[in-house]
Design a protein with these regions (language model features):
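Sec-dependent N-terminal signal peptides
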Residues: 5-14
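Glycine/tyrosine- and acidic-biased, solvent-exposed loop/turn segments at the edges of beta-strands
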Residues: 17-398
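N-terminal secretory signal peptides that target proteins for export/translocation
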Residues: 1-2
Length: 398
């Protein structure tokens, strides 16, 4: 963005100067001073010619009579100081030419006479230290050029005067260490560049100076190990990148330092085992992924650490057998899942293993007859359900 803006400024200058320097079909009979007038007779311009070519001083005026520009030509080309003014008489710019080419220091002003730019040229090419300003007078950009190409450190500032970035250039390419700053003036990032692309180790920071993210770039892409931190310096994420995407195991950490999650990735997608943990470090959830979709057996663990639920996934949807367990590992209940909903017969069990209920589900709701048993195995109740609503209960005669 910064380089494009600079190019635009240079383009305007080059275009404006070109208009004055060119004369496609000179009238070779013109000699001496030539005056051009507005319709009301006021002088519009005063120019000097020699054998049809502009030579000597010239002046141009606004319709109100104020001076628009003043300069000099030699053999049809701008030579020496060239100044231009706004219609109210305030200075617009001052430039210097040698043989029609910009040379030396050029200055441009806003209409309130606040400096807009100070540029240095060497035969039409920006050269040396150049400065650009906001309308409030604060410095906007300070850039170093060598024969028209950016070289060395260039700095960009916010309108309030605080530093925005420092960029190192080599032969018109961003190269080496560049820095970005937050609006409060604190260092936000340190980037390494190689020929306009981020390349090598880089860091971002919180405004308290603590490292926020450590990463490595290669040819503009995130590659290799990366770490993220909280403002207090505690590790929050460990990841590996390949071509800007997660690759391998990604780990997240809780504020207390315990592992929050770890998941395997391939080509930026979850692939393989993923686990999530509770604040106390005990495992909570466990899934298997294939191409970023849950696939295979998944487990959920109770806060006490024992296996609580087991379910099968296919293409990110529950399908197959789902089981619930007691804290002693005994089966508590089992369902058949189809497209994410309970369907078909289900049984629940006492902790000691005896059958507690026999149920039937349809589209995720109890339907039909439900048998409830005593621990002894004797039938206790017979309930009737429709779409999850109990319609009746019959006490067993046994």
């Amino acid at each position: 963005m910064m380089r494009k803006g600079l190019f635009f400024l240079f383009f305007l200058c080059a275009t404006g100067c070109w208009v004055y320097a060119q004369d496609a079909s000179p009238d070779t009979t013109l000699n001496g001073e030539v005056k051009e007038r507005f319709d009301d007779g006021k002088v519009k311009s005063e120019k000097n010619y020699h054998h049809g070519q502009l030579n000597g001083p010239f002046r141009e005026y606004y319709p109100n009579g104020n001076l628009m520009s003043v300069g000099s030509y030699k053999n049809g080309q701008l030579q020496g100081a060239y100044k231009s003014y706004y219609e109210d008489g305030s200075e617009y710019f001052e430039k210097n030419y040698i043989g029609g080419q910009l040379y030396g220091t050029s200055r441009e002003y806003y209409e309130n006479e606040v400096p807009k730019s100070v540029e240095n040229y060497y035969y039409d090419a920006l050269n040396g230290f150049n400065q650009y300003y906001y309308p409030n007078g604060n410095l906007k950009m300070a850039m170093n050029f060598k024969k028209g190409k950016l070289n060395g450190i260039s700095r960009e500032y916010n309108e309030d005067g605080s530093l925005k970035n420092e960029i190192n250039y080599d032969d018109d390419h961003i190269d080496g260490v560049s820095k970005e700053y937050a609006s409060d003036g604190s260092l936000y990032a340190i980037w390494n560049y190689k020929i306009d692309q981020k390349d090598g180790p880089s860091k971002t920071f919180y405004n308290n100076g603590q490292v926020q993210w450590e990463m490595i770039f290669q040819n503009g892409n995130l590659e290799g190990p990366s770490k993220k931190y909280a403002q207090d310096g505690k590790l929050t994420l460990e990841a590996n990148y390949k071509n800007n995407q997660f690759e391998g195991v990604v780990k997240e950490y809780q504020a207390n330092g315990n592992l929050k999650s770890e998941c395997s990735y391939a080509d930026g997608k979850k692939d393989g085992e993923c686990r999530q943990f509770r604040d106390n470090g005990k495992q909570w959830l466990e899934w298997n992924y294939k191409n970023n979709l849950k696939d295979g057996v998944a487990h959920e663990y109770a806060p006490q650490g024992y296996l609580w639920m087991e379910v099968n996934f296919k293409d990110d949807v529950k399908n197959g057998i789902m089981k619930e367990f007691y804290d002693n590992g005994a089966l508590k209940q089992q369902w058949i899942i189809e497209d994410g909903m309970e369907n078909g017969p289900s049984k629940s069990y006492y902790k000691s293993g005896e059958v507690m209920t026999e149920e039937v589900y349809h589209n995720g709701r109890l339907n039909g007859v439900v048998h409830l048993y005593h621990k002894s195995g004797d039938l206790a109740y017979i309930d009737t359900y429709q779409d999850g609503v109990k319609l009746s209960r019959q006490t067993s005669s046994k």
